[in-house]
Amino acid sequence: MNALLYVLVALTWGSSFFFAKIGLDGLAPQQVATVRTVLGALTLVVVLLVTRRRWPREKRVWGHLLVVAVFLNAVPSSLMAWAEQTVPSGLASIYNATTPIMTLLALAVLVPTERLNRRQVGGIVLGIVGVLVLVGPWDVLGDPQVLASVPGQVALLGMTASYGIGLAWLRRFGVGGGYDPTTVATVQLTLAAGLMLVVAPVVATGPVQLDWRIVGAMVALGAVGTGLAYAWNTRLVGAWGAGRASTVTYLTPVVGVALGVLVLGEPLRWNEPVGGLVVLAGIALASGLLGARRRRGSGAAAAPVPAGEARAEGGR
């Protein structure tokens, strides 16, 4: 059963960029971001009610989760949707893999007790090299399509940097308050949905053209990829531990690239998978995953985050 959940999480998170790309065929970027967040929040609220979990009452928990909702949900989901107007979904899924690198950088800046060791610095440098390979600066001036995608690629780095800030906030303040991860994630997504609905009349404007493809894509992106996948991953982390569960990070770009190339017919430049592999190698080095496996037979990486969204796990 846990192996099935692992595959489901990899497929749902890996396909998030694919479904967002389809959603953009009939919705504006901020509309895609708002709909996915609202559907994800509603799905988790149903899970919370069915399982009879209680809502937090402490103001401190709600206050910190409001900050988390901004940096782990509202901002990254908006940047992701905006970026995919010009960036292929497969390449966007590869950029999502830079999240652990950004998290280490944010921890070093925002959490006084966190100090980068040589291994982590080496992993970060390797990750930066991977990003440069992904961008392909040798093609920027010679290919108008690549040049047009540069702002979107920068936005995707902003997305993962936002993850890093949010996760560093969690590490510094420990906002879980003793509540289980599903409850915390439900509050987090509900707050994010509320924020995005408030600003929707101003930023989520534009014509809406719906068909079965777009509706299905948004349900898959919101209810499944942003809602149910949270519950699945929570159970997986509980059964396997965060280190082993985090290896899904290595599969989601594979799913994203495969869907983009095979289904959407997106071009794949040689430097994109190469850069992605360099980034993943940097993550493995910085997180100590390879060394931990040699010593203990299990990973020591942080729990993964879905594409364009992230969740708070208790006092993480």
Walk through the language-model features, giving the residues of each.
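Helix-helix packing/entry segments at the starts of transmembrane helices
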Residues: V35, N73, L91-T98, W169-A193, ...
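C-terminal transmembrane-helix exit sites in multi-pass transporters
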Residues: T51, W55, P100-V125, V254-V274
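Hydrophobic transmembrane alpha-helices of multi-pass small-molecule transport proteins
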Residues: L44, L66, L105-A106, R119-D139, ...
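Transmembrane alpha-helices of multi-pass small-molecule transport proteins
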Residues: G26-V75, P100-L107, S162-G166, A185-A204, ...
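C-terminal-most transmembrane helix of multi-pass membrane proteins
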Residues: Q31, R36-V38, R213-I214, Y250-R316
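Specific transmembrane alpha-helical segments of multi-pass solute transporters/efflux pumps
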Residues: T12-A20, V45-N96, V129-V133, G222-W240
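Hydrophobic/aromatic residues within transmembrane alpha-helices
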Residues: G23, V32, R36, A83, ...
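Membrane-interface interhelical linkers
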Residues: M1-L8, A41-V68, T113-G122, D139-P151, ...
